[in-house]
Amino acid sequence: MDSGMEEEGALPGTLSGCSGLHPVLPSDLDVISDTSGLGNGVLPSMSEEKVSPTRARNMKDFENQITELKKENFNLKLRIYFLEERIQQEFAGPTEHIYKTNIELKVEVESLKRELQEKDQLLVKASKAVESLAERGGSEVQRVKEDARKKVQQVEDLLTKRIHLLEEDVKAAQAELEKAFAGTETEKALRLSLESKLSAMKKMQEGDLEMTLALEEKDRLIEELKLSLKSKEALIQCLKEEKSQMASPDENVSSGELRGLSATLREEKERDAEEWQKERNHFEERIQALQEDLREKEREIATEKKNNLKSYKAIQGLTMALKSKEREVEELDSKIKEVTTDSTKGREDPLKTQIPRFQLREGSEDCEAALVEKEALLAKLHSENVTKSTENHRLLRNVKKVTQELNDLKKEKLRLEQALEEAHQEGNRGARTIHDLRNEVEKLRKEVSEREKAVEKHYKSLPGESKTKFHTQEQVVRSLTGSGSQEDLLLQKSNEKDLEAIQQNCYLMTAEELKFGSDGLITEKCSQQSPDSKLIFSKEKQQSEYEGLTGDLKAEQNIYAHLAKTQDTDSVSNLQAELKEVLALRKQLEQDVLAYRNLQKALQEQLSEIRSREEEPFSFYSDQTSYLSICLEEHNQFQLEHFSQEELKKKVSDLIQLVKDLHTDNQHLKKTIFDLSSVGFQGSDRLELTKQEELVASKEDEDTLKFEADVETPFQSDQHLEQSREIMEDYAEGGCKSGYGRHMDSNILGHDGAQTPGASEEHTLEDELLGLLATLFSKKATPLLESRPDLLKALGALLLERICLAEQGRPGDHLDSKTEKALQQVAVQLRDELGHSFPANSFSKSYNEVKSMWGNWLVKTGDEDTVELKSVSVQTMAIEDTPHGFKPQSKRDAWAEKQEEAIFSTELESEALGEMPGQQATHLSFPSAINPDAEKTGLLIQLKTPELLENLYNLPASPEVVVAQLQGQVLELQRELKEFKTRNKQLHEKLILAEAMMEGLPVPNSALVNVPAAQAVVRTAFQDNPGEQEGPETTQSAGRDKDMDSDQYTSFEIDSEICPPDDLALLPACKENLEDLLGPSSIATYLDSKSQLSVKVSVNGTDQSENINIPDDTEDLKQKIHDLQTELEGYRNIIVQLLKHSQCSEAIITVLCGTEGAQDGLNKPKGHIDEEEMTFSSLHQVRYVKHMKILRPLTPEMIDGKMLESLKQQLVDQEQELQKEQDLNLELFGEIHDLQNKFQDLSPSRYDSLVQSQARELSLQRQQIKDSHGICVIYRQHMSTMIKAFEELLQASDVDSCVAEGFREQLTQCAGLLEQLERLFLHGKSARVEPHPQNELLKGLRTVEGNLPYHHLLPESPEPSASHALSDDEMSEKSFLSRDPKPDSDTEKYPAMASHFPQDLLMEHIQEIRTLRKHLEESIKTNEKLRKQLERQGSETDQGSRNVSACGLALHSSLTSEIHFLRKQNEALSMMLEKGSKDKQKESEKLRESLARKAESLEQLQLEYTSVREENERLQRDIIEKERHNQELTEEVCSSRQELSRVQEEAKSRQQLLSQKDKLLQSLQMELKVYEKLAEEHPRLQQDGSKCPEASDNSFDLFESTQAMAPKSASETPLLSGTDVDSLSCDSTSSATSPTSMPCLVAGHHMWASKSGHHMLGLIEDYDALYKQISWGQTLLAKMDVQTQEALSPTSHKLGPKGSSSVPLSKFLSSMNTAKLVLEKASRLLKLFWRVSVPTNGQCSLHCEQIGEMKAENTKLHKKLFEQEKKLQNTAKLLQQSKHQEKVIFDQLVITHQVLRKARGNLELRPGATRPGASSPSRPGS
């Protein structure tokens, strides 16, 4: 509609208001229509150049124009209205027509003014369009000028640069030519000197020829004499002999002279030939270089020609563009002239038409005012014309300037062409100089060929000199054969000696192989630097040396044979060289023999060292166990999953058989090598040896059963429990024979006994039994218990009954007679058996100690009711309040079954415990590691759940009182804790340092000593006996403890969920207490389960987030995404901190051990691992709590109830810590006592179970790797589902795309990390990737999760022997490195080294270095340990017990002997270290060199890659710019097409409107005629009252006619279409809404207005108002009709009085007046309609003209668009060509520069080569 309005504004205006009054207009107005056609013709001429689809008017312009037009229309209507009223008031009757005509003339004047204003506006628009075109043309010209200037300047710069370069090149060429001329002169001088030398040589050759001729003559004389003397043989034999003797010395002398001369001549000829050849090569190189220079210069000239042509073409294109611009400017000038002529014509025509009119109306003053206004308007137009003409002049000046600039450009072009011609001339000069150089080179070639010919002639003259050599060669060959035979004899003797030595070595090696076969296998697979590996290495070295010697001997024999065969062909020099080789070989043989003897001595020394070392059992057992671990750990570890059950059973049986064989071999070697009597075993230990040999098979079968079960069900905790129970029952049946549960302390009674402090004589039997047990366990007499399983069963049952009775609160006097008898029998048996095995004074341990322990325990149990209550409540909450998916169903079921068993069947539980003596023994034998608090709480939970549930209701009712009491208790407990910590800190540090030094592990940090988790792990890691913590009992307890730990762990996490955020600080304390509560065998499994549970927690958290319904609000979604992002950032920070922490721990280890990169991440201190696990899991908890709070916020009731629970939990934790500190006091004294007695029990029999423990550890490792792989698979699946859910959530709601993308990237990164972890667990080796942050995250995850299966071995199987601990570490390192080499510290420091050379070499080097360093560290640590222990024993003699003082002397002597032995071992190891370190330094240097080379190649490749990538990016940018430009052009074309379609639609709609308005006007004309007739009849009615009946009859007929016409018009109105009515209503909204606003269509802007039209058109508001007026008039007329009928009726005249007739007359007159006013209003409303001609198929000439003009304008616009696109394409092509030209020119210049530099360098090198002392100058960049 906007464009429609614009077109309406452009259409001409005709008469407004007078069309209805004057049906016939004067013929003079025809001229106006013509002028209006001219006015219409102005529009396309203006818009032909300027109107474009992009240059459209704004809505504001349209609105302003509409408002102005409305105001003018309103003012005009008001003026007309008031004028008409004034005229009616002043004049009446005949003068009315004059005033009407006057008003019409004024209206015409106003319309003419408006037309003038419109034309002025059109002129202004045209002038603006011309100005914009001129400006655009000027800007384009300026831009073209600037581009041309830039191009010209660039070309000038390039040409000047090229000229300067060519001048420099010419200068350089001249300098080179001068140097070449100087070189030729020197060569000429050299040639002359050589020619003189040649002439001298020729003279010498002539003398030699004379000598040869003389010799030939002598030979002829001798032959003649021989012929003459043959006839006289008998007579003259003596003379012949003398003559022959005389002739032979002459020949010898002459032959010697000839030889000397020939040798000198030969040397001179060779020198001459070499010099000539050098000269020839030099000239050829120079010729080639000059030819290359010629070619390059020709190429440069060709490229310059091409560039000049291109620039010429570009200049031609610019000139063409300028010409086109000039044409456009000319066209604009012509159009401006046309516009001016049209404007002048437009001014003249209305003046011509108005002159006769004004002549008619000279009498009126208004006409004069109108004329004055017209004159003023003409003056304005004249001034505007003047300004237009000045603008035209300015445009012409601009055109002149453009032509001048074109001329300048042409001049510059000519100048550039001249410069190009000059450059061509210079190129021709250079070509001439090159031609001259070629001629000189050809001359030099000819001279060289002549010299070559002379030399060839000289060589041909010397063919027969080699004949004289044969005589001398024969003599030399004879002498050599003699010497060769002597050397053969010597070689045979040496070979015999070597064979004897080899046989002796073979005998020695066969003997040693039988003894140390297993050690050889270990060295081959583990790559450890042990003495056995040195032996094999020396053997291989000797064999290789002997093979080399035999090869040398064979080579010597072949040389001699070759000499014997080719006596005649070889020369003297070759024979001499061969003699030298023989002498060198002889020397080498002697050196090899000496080296062999030295090696033999070294071998013997090593054998003696090995025999002495075999007396140490620890290293031997470590070798055995490491060999077993290698046998068990195959390369394809995870192929076991694909095996069937039968194959697994076969494999297991094979492994068991192999273990049995190895065990028997080891026993045989022990019996043969070691002397058992020297070690001093007890008889019971020997029995254990034999028993353990018999029980290997049974143990291995049970282990395989457990291994198969683990493989089949890796994730089911219930089946683990059942299997562990079955295994324990099997072990109970077999008895505790394997020595896993020996050495119990008196602290066993600290939690298994139940004697009250008030007990009296009734329990003497039990007291005796307890005293016996205390002495028994303190004296380490468990072999007796091992041989008596029935005793252990009875003891276990009795102790459990005691515990149950004590827990249920029953007194001790309710014992049955059976139990008393059983106690008596056990006491008697123990006394008898202890009397045999121990002396009497060993029972002197005081009973008070035991009693005090019982008392302490009972005091503790009294205080711990609250602890039990709390633990039970925690676990019930864990059962009831677990969220969905938080814990597996199997674990919940297992826990529920445990609770039911604990509540309803305590007797069955006690029986099961009684039937498991192995587990009981393990639990009882670790007072220092298993906290009694943990077991007491576990037993109380199982046995006292009914009582505790009853006691739950006995708490005080008011929470405030409870809170106050709990806070007071907490403060008291904290004070006590501080006191205990200050007391025990020193003891802890001393104990941990001593144990770390004894076990050969790195000392943990002082910061770690204070951490309770680290203390617990260090305590569990160093115990008395290796057998105490091994075996299936420990694994079973680990399985049970794992379930218990996981349940406790989940309960703690639930508490942390329920706690308010203020109490989150309690979480680390809870974790520390929980780790202290665990047993030693379950710490590793706890760590593993903890990491797994942390993973599960996060998984389940995400599950919960998925299960929550998708929120409708996008803000909530964004908030949750933000929270999840913060969580992810927190996890990343945790991983980075863990990585830093692991690096710090590695650095601490290297500082402590004095090595750099020797130990990898596996040798971390346990405290570090525990800290990492604790921080990781606790932070998981905190994050999970946050996540849960985000997903479902807590209610206020829960927050109120949580304060009391948190205080209770704090109290429980403080009490537990206090109890733990009290227990630690007791445990420290027991541990110090055990450490002092440790070396008494060192016997090889204890380490027989190491084979089984290694196998068990390997099976556990594999199982845990499988478990972790399964967890990774589950977590990856979960991540994929989470990504899908996230995508669905994004589709369902509107989220910020940036936030969603970031979250999606993080999720995909997590999924990628999980896939890499899964591959790592499955294949053992991860593909190499470039180092970026994703790989650092993967390393962090590996260090946290992947190292768990290897770290848990040490707390599960700690040993006192340092060497064996080291071997275990090495084995774990070996297994870990074979799977994943990345966590190694060496590979972390040098990742490139690991990628550039093979892994096997690295493994060997690292293992050798580590073993050597570890041996040294071991010896140093043992020395330090023994020294500190001696000092401690000296300082603690008064405080120690009687056993310590009794065993001090024996310990001192054994320690001194061990110290001496270790010092010797240290010296030997230091020597070995020095040797190894030198070799490794050399190898590392070589490796570094190769690394440096490869790094350089990598850098080059990276640089190339960056350059290629930059080029690609640049090309992509260009493509994107071009695409964008194309899109803009297509958008412009589309917009223009849309505008065209819109214009066409508007034209159609206006045609329809016209047709409908014509019909309306016809109906209105008919109605107006009727009203005119009525108006004529009104005065007649007033004048003639007698003619009323006739008038009434006529009026009645008129009314009938109007009533008949009204429905007709009403029926014609609905002919309007819907769209047209809408458009009309839209146009007339303003007039309908406001009472003062007039219709929207402006007077003078009437659609389809024409004086010859047969229709009337107007607004629907005007029509409605007119219709109302007519209807009102009809009602008035009806009333008047009634009144007249009443007045004229005879009845009224008869009946009515005289006064009554006056009333209807007054009414009639008032109604007449109102009718008059109604008619006046109707007449005013009729003036608003105008006369139109509806466009039909035959009558739409004007509209068709307009449509044709629009089409022509559209075609012109299309053409202009096409031309502009062409211009743009041409300019783009020109720009591309210029860029390409610049590139080509720059490349050519670079090439020429390089070529000239090379030429200069070659020319400078040539004269320098002739002088021997001169050094060739090197130019930079050449």
Swiss-Prot record:
Tissues expressing this chain: Expressed in testis, thymus, heart and brain.
Pfam family, one: CC_CDK5RAP2
InterPro entries listed in its UniProt record: CC_CDK5RAP2_MYOME, CDK5RAP2, Cnn_1N
Region of interest (Required for centrosomal attachment, Golgi targeting and CALM1 interaction), ranges: 1655-1822
Chain segments carrying region Required for centrosomal attachment, Golgi localization and CALM1 interaction: 1790-1799
Residue ranges of the region described as Interaction with PCNT and AKAP9: 1201-1822
PTM comment text: Phosphorylated in vitro by CDK5.
Annotated segments matching region CM1 motif: 50-93
Superkingdom classification of source: Eukaryota
Keyword Disulfide bond set for record: no
GO cellular component, as recorded: cell junction; centrosome; ciliary basal body; cytosol; gamma-tubulin ring complex; Golgi apparatus; microtubule; microtubule plus-end
Entry-annotated residues carrying Phosphothreonine: 1195
Region (Interaction with NCKAP5L) location: 57-195
Composition bias, Basic and acidic residues: 1372-1389
Disulfide topology: none
GO molecular function: calmodulin binding; gamma-tubulin binding; microtubule binding; protein kinase binding; protein-containing complex binding; transcription cis-regulatory region binding
Segments for region (Disordered): 1022-1046, 1350-1391
Modified residues annotated as Phosphoserine in this record: 485, 544, 1243, 1245, 1497, 1592, 1595, 1822
Region annotation Interaction with CDK5R1: where it falls in the sequence: 1655-1697
Region (Interaction with PCNT): 1688-1822
Quaternary structure and interacting proteins, as annotated: Homodimer. Interacts with CDK5R1 (p35 form). CDK5RAP1, CDK5RAP2 and CDK5RAP3 show competitive binding to CDK5R1. May form a complex with CDK5R1 and CDK5. Interacts with pericentrin/PCNT; the interaction is leading to centrosomal and Golgi localization of CDK5RAP2 and PCNT. Interacts with AKAP9; the interaction targets CDK5RAP2 and AKAP9 to Golgi apparatus. Interacts with TUBG1; the interaction is leading to the centrosomal localization of CDK5RAP2 and TUBG1. Interacts with TUBGCP3. Interacts with CALM1. Interacts with CDC20.
The protein's role, per its UniProt record: Potential regulator of CDK5 activity via its interaction with CDK5R1. Negative regulator of centriole disengagement (licensing) which maintains centriole engagement and cohesion. Involved in regulation of mitotic spindle orientation. Plays a role in the spindle checkpoint activation by acting as a transcriptional regulator of both BUBR1 and MAD2 promoter. Together with EB1/MAPRE1, may promote microtubule polymerization, bundle formation, growth and dynamics at the plus ends. Regulates centrosomal maturation by recruitment of the gamma-tubulin ring complex (gTuRC) onto centrosomes.
Record-given protein name: CDK5 regulatory subunit-associated protein 2
Gene of this entry: Cdk5rap2
